């Protein structure tokens, strides 16, 4: 299959006003997507966004391009990525578009698509859109132009959907929960979901101003929520990222519960209820402790490439339901078609209620192995992983670790980063090895 030029592993993403993320490209992308999507279906597309200041200009540009191609546009405003997937399904739209750069800083933005069933757009359709981008932009005749309107009750619809994933015979009464919305797309949704289920909610990261998304809050910056859980004497904390498709949690001791541990909780709970279909899909970055804990329960475990797209592919291939990443993308195909931080949190809380257990008790059987991840930024077109210096450092570290650990080096699919991950049974040794390889990567840039 032909390689995609514009779409990456999670749509198009970059710094606003540079490279691909320009108003001109967004206009042309809307038109190109409209040309492809108008060939079949309802000729109706949903557009949602996170809280970045640049979301307004990309929303307008996409809307204009889609309308020029003859598609009607439903605007839902700031809305979590999984909410757009859900609304795309329920409105029977031809596609959903999300304007977001997820966990990236505010000066980045991105555009990604969902198909009519709420899943990521197929590679083949993305290639068709890219082919249309090479053509000159034209406009349909005036009477065929698309219309645009705003959906005022989109947030309420999604709140009810989220609550519907919690057992009807249970409540969250008696629980004090800190909810960190990362100043992102869940700011007007997540606190309502958990409070309406009965919890006492302390919201942080719920005051977006266009430039503070993910800044020292959210699932990629856990210091604030850990402090707040301890200061408030809360039972737990739930941290979401800027577009709401990731979750990290915090127990009452202020300790972080990551995506691997959440996967263990969900898989173990599903097995207890006889509802686990097959096994669990993690990624190359998943902690070895998850693998070992699932082995103890006789639950099969497979690793995909990094990225929720690849986790989804492996789940579908094996007809399994639960998978995800240690970064907090959690997929449960019985409860949605994409990673959903709010729903994943609800499923963990449901497990706590069913088993009358705390978050610490649910995760206690899983012992995390020391794992160090270092992100090394690079510039230029050369791949530092091709450097002989890096290859030599990796080889020597792997020989030192032997069967007691592993090394993973990978180039990020969304940022100019090399991710250096080292795992083993001795934290100090793992840290030293990771720093050694990271230094080699910097020299190899």
UniProtKB/Swiss-Prot annotation:
GO molecular function list: magnesium ion binding; phosphoglucosamine mutase activity; phosphomannomutase activity
Cofactor(s), by name: Mg(2+)
PROSITE patterns: PGM_PMM
Gene3D superfamilies: Alpha-D-Glucose-1,6-Bisphosphate, subunit A, domain 3 (3.40.120.10), Alpha-D-phosphohexomutase, C-terminal domain (3.30.310.50)
InterPro entries, per the entry: A-D-PHexomutase_a/b/a-I (IPR005844), A-D-PHexomutase_a/b/a-I/II/III (IPR016055), A-D-PHexomutase_a/b/a-II (IPR005845), A-D-PHexomutase_a/b/a-III (IPR005846), A-D-PHexomutase_C (IPR005843), A-D-PHexomutase_C_sf (IPR036900), A-D-PHexomutase_CS (IPR016066), Alpha-D-phosphohexomutase_SF (IPR005841)
Catalytic activity: alpha-D-glucosamine 1-phosphate = D-glucosamine 6-phosphate
Binding residue positions for Mg(2+): 102, 241, 243, 245
Gene Ontology biological-process annotations: carbohydrate metabolic process; peptidoglycan biosynthetic process; UDP-N-acetylglucosamine biosynthetic process
Organism superkingdom: Bacteria
Disulfide bonds: none
Bound cofactor: record note: Binds 1 Mg(2+) ion per subunit.
Signal peptide: none
Keyword entries, A-Z: Isomerase, Magnesium, Metal-binding, Phosphoprotein
Post-translational modification: Activated by phosphorylation.
EC nos: 5.4.2.10
Cellular-component GO terms for this entry: cytosol
Positions of modified residues (Phosphoserine): 102
Stated family: Belongs to the phosphohexose mutase family.
Protein name as catalogued: Phosphoglucosamine mutase
Native source species: Shewanella denitrificans (strain OS217 / ATCC BAA-1090 / DSM 15013)
